[in-house]
Amino acid sequence: ISCQYPDHAQRFRALGVAAPRISVAGNLKFDRSVPVDLTQRCDELAHACLIENQLIWLAASTHDGEESLLLDSFRRLREQQPSLQLILAPRHPHRVADVEMLLKTLEYRSARLSEILKAPLQDSVDVILVDQMGMLLPLYDLADVAFVGGSLIEFGGQNPIEPALVGTPVISGPHCFNFTEVVEKLVAVGAMYQ
């Protein structure tokens, strides 16, 4: 049995699995390589989204209950930093319509990323709403700072390795118990603020 962390291996031993049958391999996401065309993809995204000269905050893998908190913070931050651009990526694509309604209710100008990729923006928006899978790595690389969701509520957080992999500073809420060891390592080296 190959485990990510020593505490997981200990759990298997507690269940009666013989120690020689257990190994600790670590998290394989740390070994992921960055695609060679990542910079080009980021440049294309920035151009299509009209955010080439913006300060970019990516709020990724957000859960129900987090977006309203993040949008409140965004409003306050934007008063101090008018060039701040929010890219909001709900964890589950089926929630995009609900998040879009929240954006309209709060009077934010928004656009779905899938539509921007079909026809680049002509006018800037307040929030870019990510509505398709497979886009986070280039968006993490494009961002100046990334919030990793599932951590403002007691969900346990999402994996913060991808933004750290591309050198983007990571912030999260207090509830990161699903990734305790990863978070501790990133906080210890100054790559993440919790």
How would you name each of these model-derived features?
Residues 1-194:
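Nucleotide-activated sugar donor-binding and catalytic core shared by glycosyltransferases
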